[in-house]
Amino acid sequence: MVSEIHVISKRDLSKHETVAVDLPLPQLGVSSIRVRTSLIGITSNNLSYAKLGDMLQWWNTWPVPLDAPAPYNDRAEWGIVPAWGFARVLESNIKAIPAKSLLYGYWPTSSHPVDLSLVPSEPEGHFREVSEHRQGLGNIYNRYNLVDESAQSEEYQAWFANVSPIWNCGYVMNRFTFATEFKPVHPLGVGAGEWTEKDADLSSAVVVSLSASSRTGRSFSWNLARDRKSDGGPLALLQATSAPDSLKANPKAAFEIKTVNYSELAAKDTIDWIAKLQPKRVVVADFGGRPKETEEFREAIKSTLPESTVFTNIQVGGEPKIMAPEEALKSMAIFKKWGLVQLNTTGIVDAGITVEGAGKYFDGAESTFRRFLEEESVADLELIWGSGVGGTNGIEKAWENIIQGTLSPQKAWVYRLE
């Protein structure tokens, strides 16, 4: 059967092709399944998977098939960017995973059949990929779980594929890093360094969310407002975004929420608003804010508040673009200047599973995500359905939009490949 694979040059991410293949299918290995990607979400996060593909081994998730046509079978030069979503089981020799069942996880942006080697995990219905070439991946990327299709509409699955993987970052930040119920977890995860109850305490802090209308930014704001003890803080939340109108319907919160455009971020009115709250601490969570305006804000707020004010800078994401070498060097200098703390969602998720137990963790995360959707937290986003790998309605076009910076953040892009 002819399938399509979307391949990307590891050396030049703007160079990409859709390749038609008719691959021979070997005998299924022991404790294995064969699947085809069914429904996946595409966001600017997919660019991060490519930019950091070597460092975090995301390129190893789904290597290009060696029997694909040359030159696209050269794994040193070409790769497949993974995406979150659902896949249909074509064959299985694992009793707990029957053929035709649906799995959620991290899939290739292609329609060719792929094999997974799985062992049972916790809770029931979850499995762990144990192929040797994937062992450098973070645990969350090797986790797959069966889906009860009778309990999920296709529309819910689409929102889950596009929003939930990124939303999860804001959920674990609130629940485990700025914890009110558990021992706090360092933003990079267990073993990354000291992160005390004082570090987690937001009761006397103003939180500043940069790129607040991003999916991660929305998640963090909503979780602070709707999934936190009322006495756990913060004093207030400042949201900076290029699209303030998208955040008009703020979640109901026990604290004040102010939303500004980047041009207003370092303005006197904004700085005075923070100063009047007399915070002992300012926590800046950067989900991909504009560097110039962010730097101006940090300088302005630091020079205005008392010297005793504690500043905590959490770096979650960057601007969704390919960064030139000089921009990368400048970014590194800013990290050092402000003592930025990098966040790693995978490390916090691992800690959360350890603290709560896998069953409680995943049940809690999904039920909280459902509440997030029910409260219309992404009501301004338009769900856009695409299909296939190649062409103007397929994944190939989505990648071109990502590279060109024209993938609209106000749209939730999902693609049917089944």
Per-region residue spans from a language model:
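NAD(P)H dinucleotide-binding glycine-rich loop of Rossmann-like/cofactor-binding domains
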Residues: 102-205
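ADP-ribose/adenylate-binding Rossmann-like module
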Residues: 284-287, 306-325
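Rossmann-fold NAD(P)-binding glycine/threonine-rich loop
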Residues: 301, 317-338
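Adenosine-nucleotide cofactor-binding segment
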Residues: 226-297
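N-terminal Rossmann-fold NAD(P) dinucleotide-binding loop
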Residues: 217-218
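C-terminal hydrophobic helical "lid"/dimerization subdomain
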Residues: 347-418
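Glycine-rich beta-strand-centered segment in the early N-terminal region that forms part
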Residues: 24-41, 54-112
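Eukaryotic N-terminal targeting leaders
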Residues: 1-27, 416-418
